[in-house]
C-alpha cells in the first residue's frame, strides 16, 4: 500500500525512459496499466504499451510530450502536468547518464497532480566518469561478476546471450563483427573491446 496525503482516487500509469540498443535511440515506454509487472502487460495486452522514440539530433520535443499525455487519456490540468512530468523525466534521464529510468506506478490524483511513486534507475557505466559521486553508490554484487572483473582490468565488456565470443580492438569493429556473426547464423556471446589497453 502507498500512502498519499491527498485525494484518494488515483489512476496508475507506467512510464520509463530507456536506451533501445537496436535502434541506437532513447525511447519512452508508457502504458495506462501502471502498478503491475510491465512484462505481464506486454505478454497479455501488448496494445496497451506505447513507445515514443526520441531523435538524438533534436531531443524530446513538445509534440511528443503532448502525444504521450493524450495516449494516456489525460485532459485539462492533468494533461499539462503530464507533459511537464515527461519533459522533466527525460531531462533527468539524460542528466544523470541513465540507461533506464522507470516509474511504476505513476499516479494521476483526482486533483490532477502527477506523482512518481516508485522509481528504478540504471546508470550507464560509460558515463560514470562524469559523476564520480556515483561510485560510492555502486553495488558490484548486483552486477555480472565477469563485467566487474573486466571493468577493473580497464576493458569494455558486455555479456550477451549468444555462443560466439568477440574480442576486438575498437567499438566500430566490435559492432561490425557482431553483425557478421548474426548474418552467419550465430549469436554474439559478448562484446569485448580491448582497444587502447
Annotate each language-model stretch with its function.
Residues 1-103, 107-197:
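ATP-dependent carboxylate/acyl-activation modules
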